[in-house]
């Protein structure tokens, strides 16, 4: 009898021990009511990590029972412990499943630095560490206004390699341009820097205009690429002064791609090119309205060439058919006015490529022009443009 009592006591003790153990261990028979994660969305740069932590109801179901998965491991992976690793740009959905319930986190991998103010953009530019092949990516999160008291160059890109996505936002500002130390400009590229601008509107405006200033300076050996969604409006001129859209220095390169557009109104130069500067048209368009030009008499190389000096006139390279409304004007006002003499032969001003041959349609989009009293006329009594093989040339008649 005594042995029987001992047996039942041992059995009760074992039962109690098992019951108590259930409070600390996952019970596969307990249904999951809900599961949530500490993040519903994540934005990471390539190589960055973040841990997702699940909360399960009831809490008797432990995190060890969660099964993790990624629908796009080429973008982001997840470990059995919920550690998310960003792999490459894109989006991926991370799913945490606990039995019949699941929760998700949308992971966006982007190597772009988001900026919303002038100060943030300056900092992003100054700290950029990208290379020519893999530039630092910056994206605007809103409209950026550059105050009139900004530094001489609002954004100086010194030897950096940067790509700015405007996010379809504009950069604007008033530039008080009067040929003094207070002259302002938006961007300056120096010391081999490269910059690509996409999905960005730039509007230049000023109380006084000067040929001394440009919205963007591309100094020697630097490269500026204008891509899809880029638009630069270089403003309205005042009297005979001009605001330059982009100034391209010696051995510097301006590339236009996609639907990029440069335009002006009444006066002003879209592009001012130095003698050995390069303008490559892979797409996009330049529209010179009324007296506006893409290259004017203020281009010293053009003036020297017209005077008979042996210098190189900057050449435009066309790599695709130009848009129908493109309008390129070479302003010969000073030469005609002062009766400069033209050296013998012809100057190549536009050339095609191995993959694209210029046509008569392209020729019709380039003009020689001069200002006259009361407006602008195309000038063809002393000069002419003509198609010669895969080049458009200028010569004296």
Predicted segment positions?
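Extracellular/surface-exposed low-complexity segments
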Residues: 5, 122, 283-284, 298, ...
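C-terminal motif of bacterial Sec signal peptides marking the signal peptidase cleavage site
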Residues: 16-19
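Extracytoplasmic soluble-region selector
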Residues: 21-112
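Acidic Gly/Asp/Thr-rich repetitive segments characteristic of extracellular carbohydrate-active
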Residues: 59, 112-141
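Detector for repetitive beta-architecture
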Residues: 91, 135-137, 142-143, 154, ...
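Short, T/G/N/S-enriched strand-turn elements that build extracellular solenoid repeat scaffolds
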Residues: 120-131, 146-157, 164, 185-189, ...
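Extracellular beta-strand-rich solenoid/capping regions of secreted or surface-exposed proteins
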Residues: 146-163, 174-199, 203-224, 246-251
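Beta-strand-rich solenoid/repeat architectures in extracellular/passenger domains
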Residues: 169-183, 198-212, 224-242, 254, ...
